[in-house]
């Protein structure tokens, strides 16, 4: 059987048996997409088909795009990776570290040692974390009544650090701060900068922070898994459309086809349709580990309705680049060491394999993250892609 037959069979069966309400996936090489499929429904029960042009919430798949945009400004000398970030954003100076809580339940804070840098913000080593995988920060947000990051309110960024900058790796909101640095250095909003410098050159005309009416007409909604084959529609779950800040860590909507254009730009070492979007040496710099001996570990859930415990390829070494996860050992799917990847909260996933010159994009719209059915389905799809190389 061909890849198309095998992948169609795999994905359609997952919809037929109720594993996922809807799914889209594609495989691409440096020239173009050579498999794409869409199955199931955008909104469970409404009869509207999930198709490759369905608009989905990218969530943290936004991070790689923000990383690429920031690196354009590094190329131009408008931002520096290792200078104190407070030179661009004074509010990043003299941050506090949350040590825990005292007997009265109040936060215990101390001054951070060391300066936050842009490199740390892009690699999750700045000390900024998400509450979703950190119980202390769940408690801190409850105590202080700080909004969560998904609110896109500036107050959501004003949290202490979990550790001193550069001392370890923990997944967090650093890339939202990197987006703020881009805005300060470019004089544009994140969305306007992305449009001018990435989306227009790449032809990504279905990708934006703010949904157009036309995009909304093709949009899938997020479903919360209640059981093996039972879902609850989350009609209200949407990134604020009049945000205080555009969320570089997770605010974009897109299609798998649009995201594949970004994947191909990376596979082509920064070139898209004859335009040099990033220098080849910049793409190479983004594609290697920048966290030294730190490793990307299991993310232990502190908010079960948002995420399960999450780890890709348990037991394998994973680093982090600018801003992708970097696989350091060959994976059982066939993905080799040196490949780049990450994911979005509603169980969307991508990978970029420079060695074989291929990549893949997969999306469902299911929470919690690291869904017990969708993640294995994505890995099965990836395995088929490699079996058919």
Provide a role label for each language-model segment.
Residues 3, 7, 58, 62, ...:
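Hydrophobic (often cysteine-bearing) scaffold residues that line and stabilize catalytic clefts
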Residues 339, 346-355:
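Short, surface-exposed beta-strand/loop micro-motifs that present aromatic residues
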Residues 34, 351, 357-366:
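Short, well-ordered beta-strand elements
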Residues 87-332:
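Short, surface-exposed loop or secondary-structure junction motifs
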Residues 2-58, 78-80, 94-103:
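Short, conserved catalytic-motif segment at the N-terminal edge
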Residues 6-12, 25, 31, 57-85, ...:
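Active-site SXXK
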Residues 42-51, 369-379:
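A short, polar/charged loop-to-alpha-helix boundary motif
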Residues 376-389:
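Surface-exposed amphipathic alpha-helical segments
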């Amino acid at each position: 059987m061909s890849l198309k037959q095998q992948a169609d069979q795999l994905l359609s069966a997952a919809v037929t048996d109720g594993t996922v309400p809807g799914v889209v996936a594609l495989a691409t090489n440096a020239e173009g997409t050579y498999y794409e499929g869409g199955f199931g429904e955008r909104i469970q029960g409404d009869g509207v088909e999930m198709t490759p042009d369905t608009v989905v919430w990218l969530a943290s798949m936004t991070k790689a795009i923000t990383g690429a945009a920031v690196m354009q400004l590094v190329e131009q000398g408008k931002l520096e990776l290792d200078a104190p970030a407070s030179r661009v954003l004074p509010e990043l100076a003299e941050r506090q570290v949350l040590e825990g809580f005292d007997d009265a339940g109040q936060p215990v804070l101390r001054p951070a040692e060391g300066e936050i840098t842009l490199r740390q913000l892009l690699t999750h080593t700045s000390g900024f974390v998400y509450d979703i995988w950190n119980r202390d920060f769940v408690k801190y947000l409850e105590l202080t009544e700080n909004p969560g990051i998904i609110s896109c309110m500036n107050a959501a960024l004003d949290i202490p650090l979990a550790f001193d900058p550069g001392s370890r790796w923990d997944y967090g909101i650093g890339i939202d701060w990197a987006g703020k640095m881009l805005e300060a250095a470019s004089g544009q909003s994140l969305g306007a900068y992305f449009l001018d410098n990435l989306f227009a050159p790449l032809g990504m005309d279905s990708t934006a922070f703010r949904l157009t009416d036309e995009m909304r007409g093709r949009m899938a909604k997020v479903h919360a898994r209640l059981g093996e084959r039972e879902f609850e529609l989350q009609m209200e779950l949407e990134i604020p459309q009049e945000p205080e800040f555009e969320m570089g860590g997770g605010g974009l909507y897109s299609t798998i086809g649009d995201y594949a254009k970004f994947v191909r730009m990376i596979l082509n070492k920064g070139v898209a349709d004859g335009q040099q979007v990033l220098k080849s040496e910049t793409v190479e710099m983004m594609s290697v580990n920048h966290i030294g001996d730190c490793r990307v570990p299991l993310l232990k859930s502190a908010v079960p309705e948002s995420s399960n415990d999450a780890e890709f390829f348990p037991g394998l070494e994973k680093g982090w680049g600018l801003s992708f996860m970097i696989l350091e050992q060959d994976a059982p799917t066939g993905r080799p060491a040196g490949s780049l990847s990450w994911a979005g909260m509603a169980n969307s996933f991508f990978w970029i394999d420079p060695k074989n010159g291929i990549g893949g994009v997969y999306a469902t719209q299911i929470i919690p993250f690291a869904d017990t059915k969708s993640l294995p389905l994505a890995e099965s799809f990836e395995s088929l892609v490699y079996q058919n190389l």
